[in-house]
Amino acid sequence: MAGNKKQVKKNTKPIVVDIDDKPLLDTSNLDTAVQTSASTKKDGKKVTATTTTTTPTPTPTPTPTPTTTTTTEKKSKEIEIVPTPSNVPASISASTSNVVIAPAVEAQITDDFSVVPEKNKNKKKINSTATDGTTTTTNIPKPTPVRAPITKKGNTAPRSQFHLLALDEDDITFDETHSHKEEPKQPQQQHSTKKSSSKQQATQNVSSSSSSKKSKSKETKKVEPTPTTTTQRTTTTKSTPTPTPTPTPAATKVVEQPKEKSSPAPVKKEKEIKQNKKESEGFLFSLMESLITPGVPSVVYKIIYVALIGVLLFSLVPLYYSGLDSIYSYGVIALVLGLGISLTLFISEIPRLQASKEQKSKSGNKKSTTRKVKA
């Protein structure tokens, strides 16, 4: 059986260990490649098994010494191997009885605290039934990282995973953001409630004012007396005893007011105009009026006017040749011109003078008739 032994690397030392059932260590984050080989007693000869571990050296951290742990039961032929996240396949060789396993060395934990997976989550069991010189190799897939969910302060359940960014700071910022969003709503709600209350008060005031106005108008209508006197006057003046419908007070006012007010106004105006004219006419007007006789046409007065003007003009010629002083001649000429102007005024006012003369004559006749009737 000496020819069946495998060559062992220089840096590895075989150790024989009796394995008991103990809890496994969590080495799921370690990048390792495991190669194990076991030999059993056959035909009374003892065969030793060697284990080799190869670890990649990460650049940012010092050289870690990751470990691999394998457990087997004495009576069973199963070997349980913890999967590693590396892409390097692990070769496993097993025999039937004794297994030699490398000691468990605590690996140095890397600085990547972003994700910490749960304990004993990605473990797999591999059954290997190897004969004397045969080995079974299995390619272990890379486990997917599990992210811890962000929990609020109120949750009291124990955390199996944690994230550095998912601590109380996130909870504080979460609460602060919610508080900041909720705070500006309160003044808006108060403002809206104030607006609604002010609108309700305004509508109530308007309704109360309108109702008060309506009540006042109704009271005034009830208090106002009905104009019964006007209806009685209209009924008494009529000779027929037929009942007449009572007219509304508005209609009676419209009919009566213009008659009472319109009648004295034009009379006063006419009297004022006549008085003003008499004052302006003066003495000359009274003289011209005295010259007119009623019933004489105006054509006669015009003919007389033309004749008088002609006489005055011809009378100036002998004055010019008589040799009188210039002072006298100018005086005579002024008299002639004055007479001519007065005659023209008289002719222009003839129709007016005739009308006034006729009115006076009629009024005189009326007075005389009234005196005779009284006598």
UniProtKB/Swiss-Prot annotation:
Highest taxon listed in the record's lineage: Eukaryota
**Name of the protein this chain belongs to:** Uncharacterized transmembrane protein DDB_G0282483
Keyword Cell cycle (UniProt):
no
Per the UniProt entry, what are the Gene Ontology biological process annotations, in alphabetical order? vacuolar proton-transporting V-type ATPase complex assembly
Could you tell me the keywords of this UniProt record?
Answer: Membrane, Transmembrane, Transmembrane helix
A GO term from the CC aspect: endoplasmic reticulum membrane
Native species: Dictyostelium discoideum (Social amoeba)
Q: Where is the composition biased (Basic and acidic residues)?
A: 175-185, 256-274
- Where is the protein situated, by its record's location annotation? Membrane
Low complexity bias spans: 129-141, 198-212, 225-241
Report the transmembrane regions from the record. 299-319, 327-347
InterPro entries from the xrefs? Pkr1
- The main location is membrane
Biased composition annotated in UniProt, kind: Basic residues: 1-12, 363-375
User: What segment(s) does the record annotate as region Disordered?
Assistant: 1-76, 119-274, 355-375
The annotated regions of Polar residues compositional bias extend over 26-39
- Membrane topology listed for this record: Multi-pass membrane protein
